[in-house]
């Protein structure tokens, strides 16, 4: 299990403060401080791969753990990424945005060759598989 504290700028995946703040808010609503945000990639969606977001209490041996401090400077949250998903998220940014179309988590993934209109699925070139 690899643990990365993004406040040290050692991760190649950027987990934004706004995303950490939203995760902390959702964890508080669930009234379970043992929850962590898990981001995963599975086969499917209209472009071949799709992103998944879930809460998970369990940290697996192959998980990379990215710790992001919240904007209050006191609390932090953990982002969990399994080893298979991690290879497709190299250099990606996980963010939470608020706009005219509403609020949502977004992943800006430079490894994606194409993305669908909804932003939840993507494809990569065969030569990019690690």
From Swiss-Prot:
Gene3D superfamilies: HesB-like domain. InterPro entries: FeS_biogenesis, FeS_cluster_insertion, FeS_cluster_insertion_CS, FeS_cluster_insertion_RrpA, HesB-like_dom_sf. Keywords: Iron, Iron-sulfur, Metal-binding. Its cofactor is iron-sulfur cluster. Binds 1 iron-sulfur cluster per subunit. Pfam families: Fe-S_biosyn (PF01521). One of its GO terms (biological process) is iron-sulfur cluster assembly. Iron-sulfur cluster binds at residues 46, 116, 118. GO terms for molecular function: 2 iron, 2 sulfur cluster binding; 4 iron, 4 sulfur cluster binding; iron ion binding. Homodimer. Belongs to the HesB/IscA family. Required for insertion of 4Fe-4S clusters for at least IspG. This is Iron-sulfur cluster insertion protein ErpA. The gene is erpA.
């Amino acid at each position: 299990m690899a643990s990365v504290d993004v406040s040290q700028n050692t991760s190649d995946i950027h987990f934004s403060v706004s995303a950490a703040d939203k995760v902390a808010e959702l964890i508080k609503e669930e009234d379970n401080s043992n929850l962590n945000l898990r981001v995963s990639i599975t086969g499917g969606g209209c472009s071949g791969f799709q992103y998944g977001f879930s809460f998970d209490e369990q940290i697996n041996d192959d998980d990379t753990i990215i710790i992001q401090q919240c904007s209050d400077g006191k609390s932090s949250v953990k982002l969990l990424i399994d080893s298979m998903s991690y290879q497709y998220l190299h250099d990606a940014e996980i963010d939470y945005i608020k706009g005219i179309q509403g609020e949502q988590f977004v992943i800006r993934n430079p490894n994606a060759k194409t993305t669908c209109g909804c932003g939840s699925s993507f494809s990569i070139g065969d030569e990019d598989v690690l």
